[in-house]
Protein backbone atom coordinates (compact mmCIF):
# COMPACT_ATOMS: atom_id res chain seq x y z
CA UNK A 1 0.00 0.00 0.00
CA UNK A 2 2.71 2.44 -1.01
CA UNK A 3 0.05 4.71 -2.50
CA UNK A 4 -1.56 5.16 0.94
CA UNK A 5 1.83 5.93 2.48
CA UNK A 6 2.59 8.49 -0.23
CA UNK A 7 -0.76 10.24 0.21
CA UNK A 8 -0.49 10.14 3.99
CA UNK A 9 2.82 11.97 3.75
CA UNK A 10 1.32 14.53 1.35
CA UNK A 11 -1.80 15.12 3.46
CA UNK A 12 0.19 15.54 6.68
CA UNK A 13 1.51 18.84 5.33
CA UNK A 14 -2.01 20.19 4.87
CA UNK A 15 -4.30 21.90 7.34
CA UNK A 16 -5.32 20.12 10.53
CA UNK A 17 -8.93 19.83 9.34
CA UNK A 18 -8.02 17.52 6.42
CA UNK A 19 -8.75 13.86 7.13
CA UNK A 20 -6.89 11.33 4.94
CA UNK A 21 -9.26 8.51 3.98
CA UNK A 22 -7.38 5.52 2.57
CA UNK A 23 -9.47 3.06 0.60
CA UNK A 24 -9.60 0.39 -2.09
CA UNK A 25 -12.35 -0.15 -4.65
CA UNK A 26 -12.69 -3.86 -5.30
CA UNK A 27 -12.86 -4.93 -8.94
CA UNK A 28 -16.25 -6.29 -10.03
CA UNK A 29 -18.41 -6.74 -13.13
CA UNK A 30 -18.75 -2.96 -13.58
CA UNK A 31 -15.13 -2.00 -12.86
CA UNK A 32 -13.25 -4.97 -14.25
CA UNK A 33 -9.60 -5.57 -15.12
CA UNK A 34 -9.75 -4.48 -18.76
CA UNK A 35 -11.70 -1.36 -17.86
CA UNK A 36 -9.26 -0.41 -15.11
CA UNK A 37 -6.36 -0.35 -17.57
CA UNK A 38 -8.13 2.36 -19.59
CA UNK A 39 -8.76 4.77 -16.69
CA UNK A 40 -7.73 8.33 -17.56
CA UNK A 41 -8.22 9.80 -14.08
CA UNK A 42 -10.17 9.70 -10.83
CA UNK A 43 -11.80 12.78 -9.27
CA UNK A 44 -13.70 13.33 -6.05
CA UNK A 45 -16.34 15.77 -4.90
CA UNK A 46 -18.05 16.21 -1.53
CA UNK A 47 -21.57 17.42 -0.93
CA UNK A 48 -21.88 19.19 2.44
CA UNK A 49 -24.87 20.68 4.21
CA UNK A 50 -23.99 24.20 5.43
CA UNK A 51 -27.32 26.02 5.76
CA UNK A 52 -27.75 24.88 2.17
CA UNK A 53 -26.18 22.17 0.03
CA UNK A 54 -22.63 22.93 -1.07
CA UNK A 55 -20.92 21.00 -3.89
CA UNK A 56 -17.13 21.22 -3.67
CA UNK A 57 -15.03 21.49 -6.82
CA UNK A 58 -13.93 18.29 -8.55
CA UNK A 59 -10.40 17.44 -7.39
CA UNK A 60 -8.11 14.97 -9.12
CA UNK A 61 -6.48 12.36 -6.89
CA UNK A 62 -3.63 9.92 -7.34
CA UNK A 63 -4.40 6.24 -7.71
CA UNK A 64 -2.90 2.93 -8.65
CA UNK A 65 -4.33 -0.53 -9.21
CA UNK A 66 -3.43 -4.16 -8.68
CA UNK A 67 -4.84 -6.91 -10.86
CA UNK A 68 -3.50 -9.85 -8.86
CA UNK A 69 -4.75 -11.25 -5.55
CA UNK A 70 -3.82 -9.38 -2.37
CA UNK A 71 -3.51 -11.02 1.03
CA UNK A 72 -3.46 -8.07 3.42
CA UNK A 73 -2.34 -10.16 6.40
CA UNK A 74 0.83 -11.06 4.50
CA UNK A 75 1.63 -7.42 3.73
CA UNK A 76 0.86 -6.00 7.19
CA UNK A 77 2.02 -7.96 10.22
CA UNK A 78 -0.74 -6.70 12.50
CA UNK A 79 -3.69 -6.55 10.12
CA UNK A 80 -7.00 -7.88 11.42
CA UNK A 81 -8.21 -9.05 8.01
CA UNK A 82 -8.03 -12.51 6.48
CA UNK A 83 -9.98 -11.92 3.27
CA UNK A 84 -8.25 -12.12 -0.10
CA UNK A 85 -8.73 -9.09 -2.36
CA UNK A 86 -9.01 -10.12 -6.02
CA UNK A 87 -7.72 -6.92 -7.59
CA UNK A 88 -8.50 -3.35 -6.56
CA UNK A 89 -8.14 0.35 -7.24
CA UNK A 90 -6.03 1.94 -4.48
CA UNK A 91 -6.46 5.62 -3.64
CA UNK A 92 -6.68 8.16 -0.82
CA UNK A 93 -9.11 11.06 -0.45
CA UNK A 94 -8.49 14.23 1.63
CA UNK A 95 -11.77 15.22 3.30
CA UNK A 96 -12.47 18.46 5.14
CA UNK A 97 -14.07 17.53 8.49
CA UNK A 98 -15.26 21.01 9.48
CA UNK A 99 -19.03 21.11 10.13
CA UNK A 100 -19.73 17.49 9.22
CA UNK A 101 -23.30 16.22 9.12
CA UNK A 102 -23.25 12.43 9.02
CA UNK A 103 -26.90 12.22 7.99
CA UNK A 104 -26.44 14.20 4.78
CA UNK A 105 -22.81 14.61 3.70
CA UNK A 106 -21.60 12.36 0.90
CA UNK A 107 -18.45 11.62 -1.07
CA UNK A 108 -18.61 11.18 -4.85
CA UNK A 109 -15.82 9.38 -6.72
CA UNK A 110 -15.81 9.81 -10.51
CA UNK A 111 -13.74 7.39 -12.59
CA UNK A 112 -13.03 8.74 -16.09
CA UNK A 113 -12.52 6.52 -19.17
CA UNK A 114 -12.01 7.40 -22.85
CA UNK A 115 -14.97 8.44 -25.03
CA UNK A 116 -16.80 10.29 -22.22
CA UNK A 117 -17.42 7.14 -20.22
CA UNK A 118 -17.37 7.42 -16.45
CA UNK A 119 -18.50 5.62 -13.31
CA UNK A 120 -19.81 7.51 -10.29
CA UNK A 121 -19.48 5.96 -6.83
CA UNK A 122 -21.54 7.74 -4.16
CA UNK A 123 -20.71 6.99 -0.51
CA UNK A 124 -22.14 8.38 2.72
CA UNK A 125 -19.42 9.89 4.88
CA UNK A 126 -21.06 8.30 7.91
CA UNK A 127 -20.38 4.87 6.37
CA UNK A 128 -16.71 5.75 6.05
CA UNK A 129 -16.20 7.33 9.47
CA UNK A 130 -18.35 5.01 11.58
CA UNK A 131 -15.64 2.34 11.58
CA UNK A 132 -12.77 4.61 12.59
CA UNK A 133 -10.95 2.97 15.55
CA UNK A 134 -9.84 4.79 18.70
CA UNK A 135 -6.16 3.89 18.68
CA UNK A 136 -3.57 5.41 20.98
CA UNK A 137 -0.83 7.32 19.32
CA UNK A 138 2.30 5.32 18.83
CA UNK A 139 5.30 7.29 20.08
CA UNK A 140 8.53 6.10 18.62
CA UNK A 141 11.71 6.61 20.66
CA UNK A 142 14.13 9.01 19.08
CA UNK A 143 17.53 7.66 18.24
CA UNK A 144 20.18 9.25 20.45
CA UNK A 145 23.14 10.43 18.45
CA UNK A 146 26.13 11.67 20.43
CA UNK A 147 27.35 13.99 17.74
CA UNK A 148 25.15 15.41 15.00
CA UNK A 149 26.27 15.66 11.42
CA UNK A 150 27.18 19.35 11.76
CA UNK A 151 29.19 19.17 14.99
CA UNK A 152 29.80 22.36 16.98
CA UNK A 153 32.39 21.89 19.76
CA UNK A 154 31.37 22.79 23.28
CA UNK A 155 34.25 25.23 23.66
CA UNK A 156 33.66 28.18 21.41
CA UNK A 157 37.26 29.25 21.94
CA UNK A 158 38.40 26.49 19.63
CA UNK A 159 36.49 28.14 16.81
CA UNK A 160 37.22 31.78 17.58
CA UNK A 161 40.93 31.63 18.47
CA UNK A 162 43.08 33.18 15.75
CA UNK A 163 46.14 31.47 14.35
CA UNK A 164 49.53 33.16 14.80
CA UNK A 165 50.68 34.75 11.58
CA UNK A 166 54.24 34.23 10.37
CA UNK A 167 56.31 37.18 9.23
CA UNK A 168 57.55 35.02 6.41
CA UNK A 169 54.11 35.30 4.84
CA UNK A 170 53.68 38.51 2.92
CA UNK A 171 51.19 40.05 5.31
CA UNK A 172 51.37 43.26 7.31
CA UNK A 173 54.63 44.14 9.17
CA UNK A 174 52.95 43.53 12.51
CA UNK A 175 49.98 41.31 13.19
CA UNK A 176 47.04 43.12 14.79
CA UNK A 177 47.00 43.28 18.61
CA UNK A 178 50.69 42.31 18.81
CA UNK A 179 52.72 43.93 21.59
CA UNK A 180 56.07 45.18 20.44
CA UNK A 181 59.00 43.32 21.83
CA UNK A 182 57.03 40.11 22.43
CA UNK A 183 58.85 37.14 20.99
CA UNK A 184 56.79 35.27 18.39
CA UNK A 185 57.20 31.70 17.24
CA UNK A 186 57.36 31.53 13.49
CA UNK A 187 55.24 29.13 11.44
CA UNK A 188 53.12 27.94 14.35
CA UNK A 189 49.73 26.53 13.35
CA UNK A 190 47.02 24.92 15.43
CA UNK A 191 45.29 21.94 13.94
CA UNK A 192 41.56 21.28 14.40
CA UNK A 193 40.71 17.62 13.85
CA UNK A 194 37.53 17.00 11.82
CA UNK A 195 34.71 15.71 13.95
CA UNK A 196 33.10 12.65 12.38
CA UNK A 197 29.61 11.72 13.50
CA UNK A 198 29.06 8.25 14.72
CA UNK A 199 26.92 6.02 12.54
CA UNK A 200 23.27 6.40 13.56
CA UNK A 201 20.59 3.76 13.26
CA UNK A 202 18.04 5.23 10.82
CA UNK A 203 14.43 3.99 10.84
CA UNK A 204 12.53 4.62 7.62
CA UNK A 205 8.85 5.54 7.69
CA UNK A 206 8.04 2.68 5.34
CA UNK A 207 9.47 0.18 7.87
CA UNK A 208 7.16 1.34 10.64
CA UNK A 209 4.25 1.69 8.15
CA UNK A 210 4.13 -2.04 7.44
CA UNK A 211 4.57 -3.10 11.06
CA UNK A 212 1.77 -0.96 12.53
CA UNK A 213 -1.71 -2.01 13.60
CA UNK A 214 -4.27 -1.95 10.81
CA UNK A 215 -8.07 -2.13 10.82
CA UNK A 216 -10.16 -2.64 7.67
CA UNK A 217 -13.86 -2.00 7.10
CA UNK A 218 -15.87 -3.29 4.13
CA UNK A 219 -18.62 -0.92 3.00
CA UNK A 220 -20.87 -0.47 -0.05
CA UNK A 221 -21.83 2.58 -2.05
CA UNK A 222 -25.35 4.00 -1.90
CA UNK A 223 -26.53 2.08 -4.97
CA UNK A 224 -25.04 -1.21 -3.69
CA UNK A 225 -23.04 -1.70 -6.88
CA UNK A 226 -19.49 -1.60 -5.51
CA UNK A 227 -17.61 -2.83 -2.45
CA UNK A 228 -14.94 -0.64 -0.88
CA UNK A 229 -12.37 -1.34 1.83
CA UNK A 230 -11.51 1.49 4.25
CA UNK A 231 -8.03 1.21 5.79
CA UNK A 232 -7.39 2.70 9.24
CA UNK A 233 -3.66 2.84 9.90
CA UNK A 234 -2.39 3.26 13.45
CA UNK A 235 0.19 5.84 12.33
CA UNK A 236 -2.26 7.78 10.18
CA UNK A 237 -3.02 11.38 10.95
CA UNK A 238 -6.73 10.57 10.84
CA UNK A 239 -6.63 8.32 13.92
CA UNK A 240 -5.83 11.28 16.17
CA UNK A 241 -8.43 13.66 14.74
CA UNK A 242 -11.57 14.56 16.67
CA UNK A 243 -14.60 14.43 14.38
CA UNK A 244 -17.78 16.14 15.49
CA UNK A 245 -21.15 15.23 14.04
CA UNK A 246 -23.50 18.21 13.79
CA UNK A 247 -27.20 17.40 13.97
CA UNK A 248 -29.53 18.88 11.38
CA UNK A 249 -33.32 19.31 11.24
CA UNK A 250 -35.24 16.12 10.34
CA UNK A 251 -36.66 17.69 7.17
CA UNK A 252 -33.14 17.95 5.74
CA UNK A 253 -32.18 14.32 6.32
CA UNK A 254 -30.61 12.70 3.24
CA UNK A 255 -31.07 15.91 1.29
CA UNK A 256 -27.64 15.76 -0.37
CA UNK A 257 -28.11 12.17 -1.55
CA UNK A 258 -31.50 12.78 -3.11
CA UNK A 259 -30.37 16.12 -4.54
CA UNK A 260 -27.41 14.57 -6.35
CA UNK A 261 -29.42 11.67 -7.77
CA UNK A 262 -32.33 13.95 -8.68
CA UNK A 263 -30.05 16.39 -10.52
CA UNK A 264 -28.84 13.61 -12.80
CA UNK A 265 -32.15 11.78 -13.26
CA UNK A 266 -34.16 14.96 -13.82
CA UNK A 267 -31.74 16.08 -16.50
CA UNK A 268 -31.89 12.68 -18.24
CA UNK A 269 -35.70 12.86 -18.26
CA UNK A 270 -35.47 16.32 -19.78
CA UNK A 271 -33.03 15.10 -22.46
CA UNK A 272 -35.38 12.25 -23.41
CA UNK A 273 -38.32 14.65 -23.77
CA UNK A 274 -36.30 17.17 -25.83
CA UNK A 275 -34.88 14.46 -28.10
CA UNK A 276 -38.24 13.10 -29.20
CA UNK A 277 -39.77 16.54 -29.37
CA UNK A 278 -37.04 17.36 -31.89
CA UNK A 279 -37.85 14.17 -33.84
CA UNK A 280 -41.62 14.68 -33.94
CA UNK A 281 -41.26 18.39 -34.78
CA UNK A 282 -39.03 17.64 -37.75
CA UNK A 283 -41.30 14.81 -38.85
CA UNK A 284 -44.14 17.34 -39.05
CA UNK A 285 -41.88 19.77 -40.92
CA UNK A 286 -41.12 17.01 -43.44
CA UNK A 287 -44.90 16.41 -43.72
CA UNK A 288 -44.31 12.84 -42.49
CA UNK A 289 -42.20 12.19 -45.57
CA UNK A 290 -39.30 9.98 -44.48
CA UNK A 291 -36.53 9.73 -47.08
CA UNK A 292 -34.40 6.61 -47.26
CA UNK A 293 -30.88 7.50 -46.15
CA UNK A 294 -29.34 4.10 -45.31
CA UNK A 295 -28.86 0.90 -47.24
CA UNK A 296 -31.14 -1.79 -45.81
CA UNK A 297 -33.12 -4.93 -46.55
CA UNK A 298 -36.90 -5.29 -46.31
CA UNK A 299 -38.51 -8.42 -45.01
CA UNK A 300 -40.96 -9.95 -47.48
CA UNK A 301 -43.83 -9.76 -44.97
CA UNK A 302 -42.89 -6.21 -43.89
CA UNK A 303 -45.91 -3.99 -43.16
CA UNK A 304 -45.32 -0.22 -43.18
CA UNK A 305 -48.23 0.33 -40.81
CA UNK A 306 -46.11 -1.25 -38.06
CA UNK A 307 -43.54 1.54 -38.30
CA UNK A 308 -45.41 3.90 -35.97
CA UNK A 309 -45.98 1.29 -33.26
CA UNK A 310 -42.37 0.16 -33.70
CA UNK A 311 -41.16 3.73 -33.21
CA UNK A 312 -43.08 4.00 -29.94
CA UNK A 313 -41.69 0.67 -28.74
CA UNK A 314 -38.12 1.66 -29.65
CA UNK A 315 -38.58 5.01 -27.90
CA UNK A 316 -39.74 3.26 -24.71
CA UNK A 317 -36.79 0.84 -24.77
CA UNK A 318 -34.42 3.78 -25.27
CA UNK A 319 -35.87 5.80 -22.37
CA UNK A 320 -36.10 2.79 -20.05
CA UNK A 321 -32.33 2.45 -19.53
CA UNK A 322 -31.22 5.93 -20.57
CA UNK A 323 -27.99 7.03 -18.88
CA UNK A 324 -25.12 9.47 -19.36
CA UNK A 325 -23.55 7.22 -22.00
CA UNK A 326 -26.29 8.05 -24.51
CA UNK A 327 -25.26 9.38 -27.92
CA UNK A 328 -27.15 12.62 -27.21
CA UNK A 329 -25.12 13.42 -24.11
CA UNK A 330 -21.84 12.31 -25.70
CA UNK A 331 -22.49 14.51 -28.73
CA UNK A 332 -23.25 17.46 -26.46
CA UNK A 333 -20.08 16.75 -24.46
CA UNK A 334 -18.10 16.63 -27.73
CA UNK A 335 -19.69 19.91 -28.78
CA UNK A 336 -18.77 21.72 -25.54
CA UNK A 337 -15.27 20.20 -25.52
CA UNK A 338 -14.64 21.45 -29.05
CA UNK A 339 -16.09 24.85 -28.17
CA UNK A 340 -13.91 25.35 -25.08
CA UNK A 341 -10.70 23.47 -25.87
CA UNK A 342 -10.76 23.11 -29.66
CA UNK A 343 -10.54 19.32 -29.43
CA UNK A 344 -12.64 17.13 -31.72
CA UNK A 345 -13.82 13.74 -30.50
CA UNK A 346 -15.22 12.67 -33.88
CA UNK A 347 -14.04 12.88 -37.46
CA UNK A 348 -16.24 14.33 -40.19
CA UNK A 349 -17.93 11.00 -40.99
CA UNK A 350 -18.23 9.72 -37.40
CA UNK A 351 -21.25 9.89 -35.10
CA UNK A 352 -22.27 8.83 -31.62
CA UNK A 353 -24.99 6.18 -31.80
CA UNK A 354 -27.63 4.52 -29.63
CA UNK A 355 -28.62 1.21 -31.23
CA UNK A 356 -32.01 -0.23 -30.24
CA UNK A 357 -32.97 -3.85 -30.86
CA UNK A 358 -36.74 -4.22 -30.49
CA UNK A 359 -36.47 -8.00 -30.74
CA UNK A 360 -34.54 -8.29 -27.47
CA UNK A 361 -35.39 -4.91 -25.92
CA UNK A 362 -31.70 -4.08 -25.45
CA UNK A 363 -30.04 -0.77 -26.26
CA UNK A 364 -26.36 -0.09 -26.90
CA UNK A 365 -25.61 3.46 -25.73
CA UNK A 366 -22.85 5.75 -26.90
CA UNK A 367 -21.28 3.65 -29.66
CA UNK A 368 -18.90 5.38 -32.05
CA UNK A 369 -20.09 4.74 -35.64
CA UNK A 370 -18.62 5.62 -39.01
CA UNK A 371 -20.83 6.36 -42.04
CA UNK A 372 -19.74 5.34 -45.53
CA UNK A 373 -21.53 6.56 -48.64
CA UNK A 374 -22.21 4.22 -51.57
CA UNK A 375 -21.64 6.34 -54.69
CA UNK A 376 -23.94 4.16 -56.81
CA UNK A 377 -26.99 4.14 -54.54
CA UNK A 378 -26.28 7.39 -52.62
CA UNK A 379 -27.15 5.47 -49.47
CA UNK A 380 -25.05 5.14 -46.34
CA UNK A 381 -23.80 2.05 -44.58
CA UNK A 382 -22.58 2.13 -40.97
CA UNK A 383 -19.50 0.54 -39.45
CA UNK A 384 -18.44 0.21 -35.84
CA UNK A 385 -16.03 -1.84 -33.78
CA UNK A 386 -16.89 -5.56 -33.59
CA UNK A 387 -19.83 -5.12 -36.01
CA UNK A 388 -20.13 -7.71 -38.77
CA UNK A 389 -22.90 -6.10 -40.81
CA UNK A 390 -24.46 -2.66 -40.96
CA UNK A 391 -26.94 -2.13 -38.13
CA UNK A 392 -29.67 -1.03 -40.54
CA UNK A 393 -29.55 -4.40 -42.32
CA UNK A 394 -30.86 -6.15 -39.21
CA UNK A 395 -34.66 -6.44 -38.82
CA UNK A 396 -36.53 -4.64 -36.05
CA UNK A 397 -33.54 -2.44 -35.28
CA UNK A 398 -33.71 1.32 -34.75
CA UNK A 399 -30.87 3.79 -34.36
CA UNK A 400 -30.32 7.27 -32.99
CA UNK A 401 -27.27 9.14 -34.33
CA UNK A 402 -25.92 12.52 -33.28
CA UNK A 403 -22.91 14.47 -34.55
CA UNK A 404 -20.55 16.88 -32.82
CA UNK A 405 -22.43 19.81 -34.38
CA UNK A 406 -25.67 18.48 -32.77
CA UNK A 407 -27.28 17.08 -35.93
CA UNK A 408 -29.74 14.37 -34.83
CA UNK A 409 -30.90 11.36 -36.93
CA UNK A 410 -33.64 8.89 -36.01
CA UNK A 411 -33.35 5.83 -38.28
CA UNK A 412 -36.18 3.32 -38.76
CA UNK A 413 -36.14 -0.18 -40.27
CA UNK A 414 -35.70 0.12 -44.02
CA UNK A 415 -33.14 2.92 -43.64
CA UNK A 416 -35.78 5.67 -43.44
CA UNK A 417 -34.66 8.68 -41.49
CA UNK A 418 -35.92 11.74 -39.63
CA UNK A 419 -33.27 14.41 -39.09
CA UNK A 420 -33.07 17.73 -37.27
CA UNK A 421 -30.83 19.93 -35.13
CA UNK A 422 -30.88 19.45 -31.38
CA UNK A 423 -31.30 22.83 -29.68
CA UNK A 424 -29.29 23.71 -26.57
CA UNK A 425 -30.61 25.39 -23.44
CA UNK A 426 -28.91 27.59 -20.85
CA UNK A 427 -28.54 24.84 -18.22
CA UNK A 428 -26.86 22.40 -20.63
CA UNK A 429 -23.41 23.93 -20.34
CA UNK A 430 -23.63 24.02 -16.53
CA UNK A 431 -24.55 20.32 -16.39
CA UNK A 432 -21.73 19.31 -18.70
CA UNK A 433 -19.17 21.37 -16.81
CA UNK A 434 -20.27 19.51 -13.69
CA UNK A 435 -20.37 16.02 -15.17
CA UNK A 436 -17.86 16.12 -18.05
CA UNK A 437 -15.71 19.19 -17.37
CA UNK A 438 -12.72 17.11 -16.26
CA UNK A 439 -12.57 15.08 -19.52
UniProtKB/Swiss-Prot annotation:
Where in or outside the cell it occurs: the entry states: Virion; Host nucleus
Naming one, the record's GO cellular component terms include:
host cell nucleus
Stretches that traverse the bilayer:
none
* Family matches, as InterPro entries: UL17-like (IPR007640)
Write the record's keywords in alphabetical order, separated by commas. Capsid protein, Host nucleus, Late protein, Viral genome packaging, Viral release from host cell, Virion
Task: Quote the Pfam families the UniProt record gives.
Answer: Herpes_UL17
Q: Which domain of life is it from?
A: Viruses
Gene Ontology process terms (BP): chromosome organization
Q: Which HAMAP family match?
A: HSV_CVC1
Query: What family does the entry list?
Result: Belongs to the herpesviridae CVC1 protein family.
What role does this protein play? Capsid vertex-specific component that plays a role during viral DNA encapsidation, assuring correct genome cleavage and presumably stabilizing capsids that contain full-length viral genomes.
Description of how the protein assembles with itself and partners: Interacts (via C-terminus) with capsid vertex component 2/CVC2.
Q: What is this protein called?
A: Capsid vertex component 1
Native source species: Human herpesvirus 7 (strain JI)
